[in-house]
């Protein structure tokens, strides 16, 4: 991990294993820019929702063992992106900490609630109407989010409240996630550098 600039909340993370080689550069206070190349086009499409609707600048490049399947790439991209957020958030002073958002996409409606609690937890309910979106296995979304929350050290509640089209269901989830995460990562000018916890730490 290389801290490019904590003042500007910018971080670069490199994670190499026998299964994947990943580089992520993240700017929490960006404008939704960046280049995505995970090797899995539908995953790129979903991470694009995070950067555009969260206004995070994200560059990600992954060389994964896609000849086996997408699993390692999707999970490890979640892990590495989660590590980047944890590092970029630093000591979490002044953070709003909590974020929530409802996002519709046509017939689909999703709610996401985020707590930058320091306690990893994923509570996810998406009643997908089919097992695959194109060639993408929908089971891999839970692997992405589990990897993310475990390493971002956050509690995440995801609920798709209604939806008939699986593409709409997951895209509304990622849009809501982006907006909720953006809210939680914002600096509250009234907090004056304090920690949003009665314990004094997150």
Swiss-Prot record:
<dbReference type="InterPro" id="IPR000807">
    <property type="entry name" value="ImidazoleglycerolP_deHydtase"/>
</dbReference>
<keyword id="KW-0368">Histidine biosynthesis</keyword>
<dbReference type="GO" id="GO:0000105">
    <property type="term" value="P:L-histidine biosynthetic process"/>
</dbReference>
<dbReference type="InterPro" id="IPR038494">
    <property type="entry name" value="IGPD_sf"/>
</dbReference>
<comment type="similarity">
    <text>Belongs to the imidazoleglycerol-phosphate dehydratase family.</text>
</comment>
<dbReference type="InterPro" id="IPR020568">
    <property type="entry name" value="Ribosomal_Su5_D2-typ_SF"/>
</dbReference>
<keyword id="KW-0456">Lyase</keyword>
<comment type="pathway">
    <text>Amino-acid biosynthesis; L-histidine biosynthesis; L-histidine from 5-phospho-alpha-D-ribose 1-diphosphate: step 6/9.</text>
</comment>
<dbReference type="GO" id="GO:0004424">
    <property type="term" value="F:imidazoleglycerol-phosphate dehydratase activity"/>
</dbReference>
<protein>
    <recommendedName>
        <fullName>Imidazoleglycerol-phosphate dehydratase</fullName>
        <ecNumber>4.2.1.19</ecNumber>
    </recommendedName>
</protein>
<keyword id="KW-0963">Cytoplasm</keyword>
<dbReference type="Pfam" id="PF00475">
    <property type="entry name" value="IGPD"/>
</dbReference>
<dbReference type="InterPro" id="IPR020565">
    <property type="entry name" value="ImidazoleglycerP_deHydtase_CS"/>
</dbReference>
<dbReference type="GO" id="GO:0005737">
    <property type="term" value="C:cytoplasm"/>
</dbReference>
<keyword id="KW-0028">Amino-acid biosynthesis</keyword>
């Amino acid at each position: 991990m290389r801290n490019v600039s904590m003042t500007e909340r910018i971080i670069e993370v490199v994670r190499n294993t026998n299964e994947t080689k990943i580089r992520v550069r993240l700017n929490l206070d960006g404008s939704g820019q960046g280049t995505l190349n995970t090797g899995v086009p539908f995953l790129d499409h979903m991470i694009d929702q995070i950067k555009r609707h969260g206004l995070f600048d994200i560059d990600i490049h992954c060389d994964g063992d896609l000849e086996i399947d997408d699993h390692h790439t999707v999970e490890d991209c979640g892990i590495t992106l989660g590590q980047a957020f944890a590092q970029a958030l630093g000591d979490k002073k002044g953070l709003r900490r909590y974020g929530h958002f409802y996002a519709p996409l046509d017939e689909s409606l999703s709610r996401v609630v985020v707590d930058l609690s320091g306690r990893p937890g994923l509570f996810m309910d998406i009643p997908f109407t089919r097992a695959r979106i194109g060639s993408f296995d929908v089971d891999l979304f839970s692997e992405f989010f589990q990897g993310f929350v475990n390493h971002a050290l956050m509690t995440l509640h995801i609920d798709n409240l209604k939806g008939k089209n699986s593409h709409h269901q997951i895209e509304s989830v990622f849009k809501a996630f982006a907006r909720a995460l953006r809210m939680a990562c914002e600096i509250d000018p009234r907090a004056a550098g304090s920690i949003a916890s009665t314990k004094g730490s997150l």
